[in-house]
């Protein structure tokens, strides 16, 4: 007997006559509809002690900054929580947006059920931090993640944290971070002993000059002197945020952007990962504009962006190169599509899996321009015919741009 598939349409199709011609409007149906569920995940944590320690470290990152008073800092402990693809991901930025941290609870790190894929943003108050700090290695801890709250259940007690607004600065930061991470390369892997040796060379106090991660024989070290294959690190003292976790780490992997725009420090605790990304300088946050602009220049139909959003939601992750091959799409087009989803905060990047993962946030294409005002300004100049190309030979472009007050600028790229 043949299988029967039932389709339910939200509206009727219609044939209408207008301006002496017939217009057919077909009702749309999609098998990939985003559902609203009261709970995304419910289950036990198999490594509750290390998961708790990583979440506390994440909260410390969110609380950290280099330009706020202690009173202002105490108000900041808001992680983004994503449940999907058998993984729990907790993310956050320092207030200066120059440090990004993420906790990944992998499939073996929990024993639970994913009822729906989703993302929420909650405030980890003192009650949650205290509950996390009291968890021991042998305890049975249950966690729930829903669209409006995150819950922690232990010893017959529960702590519930409610959803709070997601800062716009964070959405801008998420865009830059995933772009930098998607091109980062693994430079070093260290075992626990090497990791502890490395951090023993971390200088005290605030470091104002660049330092380098170098190898001295089999021992890694931080040095103010550059050497071959060294990794450049600005604001080295920010790595102290990792120190509480170092005694428990099985391994440390260090990744770097090809032009050292960021470094990523990833600690492993069995089925739990903690990663810390540093911007090039203390004063330079990931929320600054620029990283996504080149990928956003190419015009892409909005229907393609919507299709990519549905594909990402359905699969929860994808490798851009494989996606381009499988779907017969030019890789540059995939980069442009990925950049647009990232500009809405919808994509993150997993370095170990070399793939994007999906955050379920509101799909608002207008957010792309609102978070990238340089694009708006550039498009306005073009619309007002204030850009004149003088020369363009493929390697060099010279243009005259009319600015405010009629001042003409020469721009050479």
Describe each PLM feature range:
Residues 1-413:
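Long, low-complexity, compositionally biased intrinsically disordered regions
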